[in-house]
Amino acid sequence: MSSASSLAPVRALALSPPRPFRHGARRLARAPRAAASADPSPTASKLEGAAAEAYMATLAEDLTHLFDDRGIDRSLYEPTVRFEDPLTKYDDIEGYLFNIAMLRRVFDPTYTMHAIALTGDWEVSTRWTMDMSLPLPWRPSLTFTGTSVMGIDPATMRVATHFDTWDAISTQGFFLETKSPEAVAEVLRQVFDLTVQPDLETPEYVVLRRYAEYEIRRYPDVVVAETKTGGESGVSEGKRLAAGGMTGGGGGGDGSFNPFGALAGYIFGGNAEEKKMEMTTPVFTSDDGKMQFVMGRALGDDPSALPAPNDGERVGLGIRTGGVFAAVRFNGVATDASAAEAERRLSERLARDGHARKPGAPASLAQYNDPLTNPIRRRNDVLVEIEGFDNARLDL
C-alpha cells in the first residue's frame, strides 16, 4: 500500500446548523436546506452559496495531498488550529503537521474522501476511509472510517478546529480526556488480527464503514468461473454456505463431485486452450449453491473471451455482480455451522444499526487460505448485500 490520497466522488451539501459537538456524542447529519449564493464578507453571518461550494472544492482538493510529497497547504489552517481525534490531540499547526508526517512515515496510509458537506454556519465536515499497514512480521492492515468536523474562522477563512470521529467507537474525543478505552482497543484489535491474506491477486474493494463488529464494503463486478456445490443432484442437496470441495466432498449424488477440484481443473489447463491461469483469492461459496473462482484482472472483463471449460456441464463462466455488502470476518476452519452463526450475528447487527439486507440476495462465504494454513491464521468473511446505503451520510 502506498502513501497516497484519493478523492472519491464528492457531494457538497448545505445542512442546517449542528448542535455543539460533545465528547462521547455521535454526530448526526441534519436535513438539507436551501443555500444562498452570496459570497462571504467581513459581515457575513454564515458560509453559504457559491462561496461555500468554492471553499469546499478547495479543501477537498487539498486533502488529496494529505499523505503525498506535496502535503496539505498550511495556509488553509490557523497557526493555532486545534486538532483532536480518539488517539491524539494538538493545539497548533506544528503539532497538526507532525501528526500527519508521523502517520505517513510509520503507517504508510491511503486516504479516500467520500463526501464533503456544509454542516453549520462556519463548519465543514468530510467522510473518509483511511487504510494503513504496519511493518510487522504478520503484516497487519488497519482500516478506519469516520468523519472530520472542521470549524472555520470567519475572519480568516482558515480551519480553526478539526475534530475526527471513528465509526468503530461510540465515545468520541481524545481517550485520555474521555477515559474511554475504545480507541486503543480498536487499534490493538486490528494490529493483533493474525489472519493472513495470501500473496495472490484479490478483487479490490473499498471499506465504506468500519464498525467494531463488521464492515460495509463496495465491491466491483468481477469475472468468475463457477460451479454448483450440489453437483448433478442439484442445488437443494448441496446448498451449503461453507467450503464445499475445499474441505472434501461437494454433495454430488455419489459424493464424488468436488466443486473446488472442478474449478481448479479449469484454471490449471482444463479448458479448450489448455491455458493455465493464476490462482486468485478468495474462493466464494454462497447459500444459493454456487462456488466461484475470481478470474485475474489480466484476463479482461468479458467472460465470453475466456477459454471454454472442458467440463462445460459443470463449470461455467460469468460475472459476480458487485455492490455494497456488509462483511464480518472470522478465523478458523470454516464450516456450515460457523458460517451460519457469523451470518446470524451480522444480520442482527445490521438490523440494530438500521441497514437493510437486499431481499432475496444470497449470503456468501469468502475463504482466503489453503487448507494447509494454520486455522488461527485463516481469513473467512461472510458477506450479505445491503440496499439503500447512502455513503455520503455523516451519521452512519
Language model region names:
Residues 18-27, 32, 131-195:
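A beta-strand edge to alpha-helix "cap/lid" segment located at domain peripheries
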Residues 116-123, 151-159, 319-322, 351-357:
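A short, structured loop/turn motif at beta-sheet edges
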Residues 57, 61, 70-127:
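A solvent-exposed, acidic/Ser-Thr-rich amphipathic alpha-helical stretch
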Residues 46-68:
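Short, aromatic-enriched amphipathic alpha-helices that serve as compact interaction elements
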Residues 111-117, 145-152, 315:
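Hydrophobic/aromatic beta-strand elements that line small-molecule binding cavities or substrate pockets
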Residues 1-25:
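N-terminal chloroplast transit peptides
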Residues 1-8, 28, 32-42:
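N-terminal mitochondrial targeting presequences
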Residues 186-396:
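A solvent-exposed interaction/effector surface
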